[in-house]
Amino acid sequence: MEELIDKIKERVKEREKESDVMANGYFYDFRKNVFKGKMDEKYISMFLEGDGSELVSKACAPHSSSMLGYNFFHWINKEHKLTITFNDKKEITYNEVLFEVKIPVLNGKKEANMDIVLRNNKTGEWLFIESKFTEYLNRGKFKMSDSYRNESLYFKKDYRDKWTRIIDSISGSSKETGYWDGIKQEICHLIGLTNWLDKCVEIKGKEYNNEDVRFIILVLEPDEERFKNEYDKFTDYKKLYYSFYE
């Protein structure tokens, strides 16, 4: 395992004497993988409604991005709001948090899961967040399913040509290994959000209604001195991510 993950597991193993942690540092139950207190039942339901056993299994890992998202944001509600000032200087306050929100991407195909969604349920703003923790340590080649070339699977026929042009341009420049799975997920989420913005689909039973909508990636930046190898891979992914939008 990479050094950063090993450090996390060492800390978790300190709790091995308790019945909720296995010898390998993973939790027996994802509901125990929280920084403090107990996981609220409504959030447990959100995780169980995600991708079933696969998601629950991954959420037992101490380096789970999904649980990192939960631990960072679960406290947000109408009494405890989060205000963010964005790069465009706009200040938005969020008073609701949702986890593992399903977003339709291709018609009849598996939906994408958005790790975290922040909302202001009074004024209508949305912030979609894809949580990354240590995923960028994984290397591989860029590959999208052939389904993305099938015009009949898109909610609007003209989507197919637009997205395949983007996919082809990335495929042509992705000869080196890197965390390309992150770019693949980015494309899936952007297709899904485009479907919603064009009112082809609903998200959480809601149709887009001209609200302020934003999408960000949350990535943990390792300490350069303590985790040099991981930091280098983080900077590699940062360059790769920004090149996607060039």
Place the predicted regions along the sequence by residue.
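Phosphate/oxyanion-binding active-site loops and adjacent basic polyanion-contact surfaces
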Residues: 61-69, 109, 178-188
